[in-house]
């Protein structure tokens, strides 16, 4: 089955072609980072308008790269949520219109299920069951995965997601958008031990997260440094390192607890923050000590992309899942509501 995947949940337009027998044939992505940088964050209306502008040219590009024509496509998968409603509607309406014109089915895909299954596109994919850490700008969740659509939520953030905390902390220190990569870049030049931040909710049992207090601690530390006359690049680097260490250690501690609770030794990390090198190193060491395995997607598939949507959609379409031509998207959509395959 040849599936065209469309991703428009936020600020990246992703298109890909996935074949159930030949694998990923082509993918293309346009990031709106430069468009939103001047505003310090994503502007929903601008995001939607840019998706409209980019979608069809990217589809043509992917078809050309794969050497395919529309008549060869068996189905279209598109992100139906969660995400920005306006942005989601661009992808959904495009997918349904093309599906109607080409006489093929279209299927809405859960954005975070796409992220969760992205490591399946690698040469050594994880086997079910496993524990997944979904960590991005909008989500921080620990999920027990027994199969596609068989998800048990083990823990999640009570406030800010980890990626959101990265971005907000970076913005408070006057760093460029997006803040996560900026924090990671500065942390590489930071001096360890100059600052120490709390590991939120690690002093109590359970698998819930909270990053708003950590963000406030970083803000207070930065303001105190500025008040003392030190707003140097090195001060930013040292705070960035301490902040990143706190987030990484918190995520690592919770992942270890989740694995023990589930009785598993396989961990999948997915979402934009999973590209963070310090997080990967920490989790690899933890799984190594447990004699377990950790899996993640290649860096370009950690952030939003069409390939993960095409793959996730293909799995459900092959299982016989279909939907009507009605255009329906959801800004919020718990993964536990998905039907199992």
Swiss-Prot record:
A molecular function (GO) term: iron ion binding
UniProt keyword annotation of DNA-binding present: no
Enzyme superclass (EC): transferase
Binding site for substrate: 134-138, 167, 180, 276
Top-level taxonomic group: Bacteria
Cofactor: Fe(2+)
InterPro entries: ATPase_NBD, Gcp-like_dom, KAE1/TsaD, TsaD
Main localisation: cytoplasm
Cofactor comment: Binds 1 Fe(2+) ion per subunit.
Catalytic activity: L-threonylcarbamoyladenylate + adenosine(37) in tRNA = N(6)-L-threonylcarbamoyladenosine(37) in tRNA + AMP + H(+)
Keywords: Acyltransferase, Cytoplasm, Iron, Metal-binding, Transferase, tRNA processing
Compartment(s) of residence: Cytoplasm
GO biological process: tRNA threonylcarbamoyladenosine modification
Function: Required for the formation of a threonylcarbamoyl group on adenosine at position 37 (t(6)A37) in tRNAs that read codons beginning with adenine. Is involved in the transfer of the threonylcarbamoyl moiety of threonylcarbamoyl-AMP (TC-AMP) to the N6 group of A37, together with TsaE and TsaB. TsaD likely plays a direct catalytic role in this reaction.
Xref: NCBIfam families: gcp_kae1, T6A_TsaD_YgjD
Protein name as it appears in the record: tRNA N6-adenosine threonylcarbamoyltransferase
Gene name, Swiss-Prot/TrEMBL: tsaD
């Amino acid at each position: 089955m040849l599936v065209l995947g469309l991703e428009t949940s936020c600020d990246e337009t992703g298109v890909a072609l996935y074949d159930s027998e030949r694998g990923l044939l082509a993918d293309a992505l346009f990031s709106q980072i430069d468009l939103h940088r001047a505003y310090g964050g994503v502007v929903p209306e601008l995001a939607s308008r840019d998706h409209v502008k980019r979608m069809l040219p990217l589809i043509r590009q992917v078809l050309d790269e794969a050497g395919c024509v529309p008549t060869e496509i068996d189905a279209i998968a598109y992100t139906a949520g969660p995400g920005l409603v306006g942005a989601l509607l661009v992808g959904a309406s495009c997918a349904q219109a093309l599906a109607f014109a080409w006489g093929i089915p279209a299927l809405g895909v859960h954005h975070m299920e796409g992220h969760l299954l992205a490591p399946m596109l690698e040469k050594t994919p994880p086997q079910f069951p496993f524990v997944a850490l979904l960590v991005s700008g909008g989500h921080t969740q620990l999920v027990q995965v027994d199969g596609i659509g068989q998800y048990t939520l083990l823990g999640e953030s009570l406030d800010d997601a980890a990626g959101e905390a990265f971005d907000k902390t970076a913005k408070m220190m006057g760093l460029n958008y997006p803040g996560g990569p900026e924090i990671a870049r500065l942390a590489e030049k930071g001096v360890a031990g100059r600052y120490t931040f709390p590991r939120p909710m690690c002093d109590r049992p359970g698998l819930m997260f909270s990053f708003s207090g950590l963000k406030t601690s970083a803000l207070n530390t930065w303001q105190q440094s500025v008040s003392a006359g030190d707003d140097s690049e090195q001060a930013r680097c040292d705070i960035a390192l301490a902040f990143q260490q706190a987030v990484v250690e918190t995520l690592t501690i919770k992942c270890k607890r989740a694995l023990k609770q589930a009785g598993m030794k396989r961990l999948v990390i997915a979402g934009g923050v999973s590209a963070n090198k310090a997080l990967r190193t920490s989790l690899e060491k933890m799984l190594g000590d447990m004699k377990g395995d950790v899996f993640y997607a290649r860096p370009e598939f950690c952030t939003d992309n069409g390939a993960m949507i095409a793959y996730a959609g293909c799995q459900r379409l092959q299982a016989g899942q279909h939907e009507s031509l009605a255009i329906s998207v959801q800004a919020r959509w718990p993964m536990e509501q998905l039907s199992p395959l």
